[in-house]
Amino acid sequence: MTDTPLLPSITVDTGRDPDASVIWMHGLGDTGQGWSQVVPELGLPPALSVRFVFPHAPSMPVTINQGYVMPAWYDIRAADLTSRADLAGVSASRTRIEAMIAAERARGVAASRIVLAGFSQGGVIALHTGLRHAERLAGIVGLSTYLVDPGSLAAEASDANRAVPILLAHGLRDPVIHYEWAEASRNALEKGGWKVEWHAYPMEHEASHAEIRAVGSFLTRVLAAKASG
Protein backbone atom coordinates (compact mmCIF):
# COMPACT_ATOMS: atom_id res chain seq x y z
CA MET A 1 0.00 0.00 0.00
CA THR A 2 2.94 2.34 0.54
CA ASP A 3 3.56 2.48 -3.25
CA THR A 4 0.25 4.29 -3.72
CA PRO A 5 0.80 7.95 -4.70
CA LEU A 6 -0.16 10.33 -1.92
CA LEU A 7 -3.25 12.43 -2.40
CA PRO A 8 -2.74 16.20 -2.45
CA SER A 9 -3.57 17.60 0.96
CA ILE A 10 -3.53 20.59 3.27
CA THR A 11 -1.59 20.28 6.51
CA VAL A 12 -2.07 22.31 9.67
CA ASP A 13 0.33 21.91 12.60
CA THR A 14 -0.81 23.04 16.04
CA GLY A 15 2.74 23.25 17.38
CA ARG A 16 6.38 22.53 16.66
CA ASP A 17 7.51 18.99 15.83
CA PRO A 18 4.05 17.39 16.04
CA ASP A 19 4.16 13.85 17.41
CA ALA A 20 0.54 13.00 16.61
CA SER A 21 -1.51 13.12 13.42
CA VAL A 22 -5.16 13.46 12.47
CA ILE A 23 -6.06 12.50 8.90
CA TRP A 24 -9.42 14.15 8.22
CA MET A 25 -11.51 13.32 5.12
CA HIS A 26 -14.07 15.75 3.71
CA GLY A 27 -17.50 14.96 2.29
CA LEU A 28 -18.84 14.64 -1.26
CA GLY A 29 -18.09 17.61 -3.51
CA ASP A 30 -15.85 19.30 -0.95
CA THR A 31 -12.07 19.56 -0.56
CA GLY A 32 -9.73 19.43 2.39
CA GLN A 33 -9.67 23.22 2.45
CA GLY A 34 -13.11 23.53 4.04
CA TRP A 35 -12.40 21.31 7.02
CA SER A 36 -8.94 22.77 7.61
CA GLN A 37 -10.71 25.83 9.02
CA VAL A 38 -12.02 23.89 12.05
CA VAL A 39 -8.65 23.29 13.72
CA PRO A 40 -8.70 26.47 15.84
CA GLU A 41 -12.29 25.67 16.90
CA LEU A 42 -11.32 22.31 18.41
CA GLY A 43 -9.93 23.91 21.56
CA LEU A 44 -6.90 21.62 21.80
CA PRO A 45 -4.52 22.33 24.68
CA PRO A 46 -1.39 24.27 23.64
CA ALA A 47 0.86 21.46 24.86
CA LEU A 48 -0.65 19.00 22.37
CA SER A 49 1.27 19.30 19.09
CA VAL A 50 -0.71 17.67 16.28
CA ARG A 51 -0.37 17.61 12.52
CA PHE A 52 -3.77 17.69 10.80
CA VAL A 53 -3.76 16.30 7.27
CA PHE A 54 -6.76 17.16 5.08
CA PRO A 55 -6.49 15.16 1.83
CA HIS A 56 -8.42 16.10 -1.30
CA ALA A 57 -10.49 13.25 -2.75
CA PRO A 58 -10.02 12.51 -6.46
CA SER A 59 -12.71 13.76 -8.85
CA MET A 60 -15.03 11.21 -10.44
CA PRO A 61 -18.53 10.97 -11.95
CA VAL A 62 -21.16 10.51 -9.24
CA THR A 63 -24.17 8.50 -10.38
CA ILE A 64 -26.70 9.96 -7.94
CA ASN A 65 -25.76 13.46 -9.17
CA GLN A 66 -26.46 12.62 -12.84
CA GLY A 67 -22.86 11.63 -13.45
CA TYR A 68 -21.51 15.07 -12.60
CA VAL A 69 -17.76 14.98 -11.94
CA MET A 70 -16.85 16.12 -8.43
CA PRO A 71 -14.48 15.28 -5.59
CA ALA A 72 -15.63 11.96 -4.13
CA TRP A 73 -14.20 9.10 -2.13
CA TYR A 74 -16.46 6.65 -4.00
CA ASP A 75 -19.45 6.66 -6.32
CA ILE A 76 -22.93 6.93 -4.81
CA ARG A 77 -25.22 4.79 -6.94
CA ALA A 78 -28.57 5.18 -5.16
CA ALA A 79 -30.23 7.03 -2.31
CA ASP A 80 -31.07 3.94 -0.24
CA LEU A 81 -28.67 2.56 2.35
CA THR A 82 -28.10 -0.97 1.06
CA SER A 83 -27.06 -0.08 -2.50
CA ARG A 84 -25.73 3.41 -1.83
CA ALA A 85 -21.96 2.93 -1.79
CA ASP A 86 -19.69 1.60 -4.53
CA LEU A 87 -17.67 -0.88 -2.48
CA ALA A 88 -14.85 -1.06 -5.03
CA GLY A 89 -14.50 2.70 -4.72
CA VAL A 90 -14.55 2.48 -0.93
CA SER A 91 -11.75 -0.08 -1.10
CA ALA A 92 -9.71 2.12 -3.44
CA SER A 93 -10.05 5.05 -1.05
CA ARG A 94 -9.02 2.84 1.83
CA THR A 95 -5.80 2.11 -0.05
CA ARG A 96 -5.19 5.83 -0.53
CA ILE A 97 -5.71 6.57 3.16
CA GLU A 98 -3.48 3.66 4.15
CA ALA A 99 -0.78 5.43 2.11
CA MET A 100 -1.43 8.62 4.08
CA ILE A 101 -1.05 6.66 7.33
CA ALA A 102 2.20 5.16 6.04
CA ALA A 103 3.52 8.65 5.27
CA GLU A 104 2.87 9.75 8.84
CA ARG A 105 4.52 6.58 10.14
CA ALA A 106 7.53 7.30 7.91
CA ARG A 107 8.03 10.69 9.56
CA GLY A 108 8.15 9.01 12.96
CA VAL A 109 4.56 9.13 14.23
CA ALA A 110 3.46 5.95 15.97
CA ALA A 111 0.26 4.38 14.66
CA SER A 112 -1.11 4.71 18.19
CA ARG A 113 -0.79 8.49 17.79
CA ILE A 114 -2.83 8.67 14.58
CA VAL A 115 -6.56 9.42 14.39
CA LEU A 116 -8.71 8.97 11.30
CA ALA A 117 -11.61 11.41 11.03
CA GLY A 118 -14.17 12.29 8.40
CA PHE A 119 -17.48 13.89 7.54
CA SER A 120 -20.18 12.09 5.52
CA GLN A 121 -18.37 10.15 2.76
CA GLY A 122 -15.12 10.93 4.52
CA GLY A 123 -16.47 9.40 7.71
CA VAL A 124 -17.33 6.23 5.79
CA ILE A 125 -13.68 5.98 4.74
CA ALA A 126 -12.40 6.78 8.24
CA LEU A 127 -14.47 3.96 9.72
CA HIS A 128 -13.84 1.49 6.91
CA THR A 129 -10.08 2.05 6.97
CA GLY A 130 -9.55 2.47 10.69
CA LEU A 131 -11.40 -0.66 11.73
CA ARG A 132 -9.31 -2.71 9.29
CA HIS A 133 -5.91 -1.09 9.83
CA ALA A 134 -3.26 -3.57 10.94
CA GLU A 135 -1.78 -1.44 13.74
CA ARG A 136 -3.61 0.04 16.71
CA LEU A 137 -4.73 3.61 16.01
CA ALA A 138 -5.44 6.34 18.56
CA GLY A 139 -9.05 6.75 17.49
CA ILE A 140 -11.68 7.13 14.77
CA VAL A 141 -14.08 10.07 14.34
CA GLY A 142 -17.16 9.83 12.11
CA LEU A 143 -19.40 12.89 11.63
CA SER A 144 -22.76 12.64 9.84
CA THR A 145 -21.79 9.26 8.47
CA TYR A 146 -22.56 5.55 8.58
CA LEU A 147 -20.90 2.14 8.53
CA VAL A 148 -20.73 0.74 5.01
CA ASP A 149 -21.05 -3.03 4.46
CA PRO A 150 -21.38 -3.90 8.17
CA GLY A 151 -21.78 -7.59 7.34
CA SER A 152 -18.11 -7.82 6.34
CA LEU A 153 -16.77 -6.28 9.52
CA ALA A 154 -16.63 -9.41 11.67
CA ALA A 155 -14.34 -11.12 9.18
CA GLU A 156 -12.31 -8.09 8.10
CA ALA A 157 -11.79 -6.05 11.29
CA SER A 158 -8.25 -5.90 12.59
CA ASP A 159 -7.63 -7.45 15.98
CA ALA A 160 -5.37 -4.48 16.72
CA ASN A 161 -8.32 -2.08 16.55
CA ARG A 162 -10.97 -4.12 18.35
CA ALA A 163 -10.85 -1.61 21.20
CA VAL A 164 -10.03 1.56 19.28
CA PRO A 165 -11.89 4.61 20.67
CA ILE A 166 -14.66 5.74 18.29
CA LEU A 167 -16.63 8.97 18.27
CA LEU A 168 -19.78 9.22 16.15
CA ALA A 169 -21.90 12.37 15.90
CA HIS A 170 -25.00 13.02 13.82
CA GLY A 171 -27.75 15.51 13.14
CA LEU A 172 -31.23 14.51 14.25
CA ARG A 173 -32.72 16.07 11.11
CA ASP A 174 -30.13 14.88 8.59
CA PRO A 175 -31.91 14.49 5.20
CA VAL A 176 -28.86 13.04 3.41
CA ILE A 177 -27.59 10.30 5.73
CA HIS A 178 -30.61 9.60 7.87
CA TYR A 179 -30.27 9.56 11.63
CA GLU A 180 -31.62 6.00 11.69
CA TRP A 181 -28.71 4.87 9.51
CA ALA A 182 -26.25 6.34 11.98
CA GLU A 183 -28.04 4.68 14.89
CA ALA A 184 -27.92 1.34 13.07
CA SER A 185 -24.19 1.82 12.51
CA ARG A 186 -23.61 2.59 16.17
CA ASN A 187 -25.62 -0.48 17.15
CA ALA A 188 -23.64 -2.68 14.75
CA LEU A 189 -20.36 -1.44 16.21
CA GLU A 190 -21.51 -1.94 19.78
CA LYS A 191 -22.81 -5.41 18.95
CA GLY A 192 -19.37 -6.19 17.54
CA GLY A 193 -17.76 -5.18 20.81
CA TRP A 194 -16.65 -1.62 20.06
CA LYS A 195 -17.33 1.18 22.51
CA VAL A 196 -18.78 4.24 20.78
CA GLU A 197 -18.93 7.77 22.12
CA TRP A 198 -22.21 9.00 20.65
CA HIS A 199 -23.45 12.56 20.13
CA ALA A 200 -26.70 13.73 18.51
CA TYR A 201 -27.46 17.34 17.65
CA PRO A 202 -30.57 19.26 16.49
CA MET A 203 -29.20 19.94 13.00
CA GLU A 204 -29.24 18.64 9.42
CA HIS A 205 -26.29 17.37 7.31
CA GLU A 206 -23.78 19.79 8.74
CA ALA A 207 -21.45 20.47 11.64
CA SER A 208 -22.02 22.56 14.74
CA HIS A 209 -19.78 24.36 17.20
CA ALA A 210 -20.80 21.98 19.99
CA GLU A 211 -19.95 19.00 17.80
CA ILE A 212 -16.53 20.37 16.89
CA ARG A 213 -15.76 21.00 20.55
CA ALA A 214 -16.79 17.41 21.34
CA VAL A 215 -14.33 16.24 18.69
CA GLY A 216 -11.66 18.43 20.28
CA SER A 217 -12.30 16.87 23.69
CA PHE A 218 -12.11 13.39 22.16
CA LEU A 219 -8.81 14.18 20.40
CA THR A 220 -7.39 15.68 23.58
CA ARG A 221 -8.24 12.52 25.48
CA VAL A 222 -7.00 9.92 22.98
CA LEU A 223 -3.82 11.84 22.15
CA ALA A 224 -3.08 13.08 25.67
CA ALA A 225 -0.31 10.64 26.51
CA LYS A 226 2.51 9.64 24.22
CA ALA A 227 2.43 5.98 23.28
CA SER A 228 5.33 3.78 22.35
CA GLY A 229 3.74 1.72 19.57
Q: PLM ranges: what are they?
A:
Residues L167-H170, D174:
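Short beta-strand/loop motif that positions the catalytic acidic residue
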Residues T2-V115:
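Serine-hydrolase catalytic machinery in alpha/beta-hydrolase-like enzymes
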Residues P55-H56, A117, V141-S144, A169, ...:
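Alpha/beta-hydrolase-fold catalytic nucleophile elbow
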Residues D19, N161-I166, G192-W194:
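Short, proline-enriched alpha-helix->beta-strand connector loops that line the catalytic pocket
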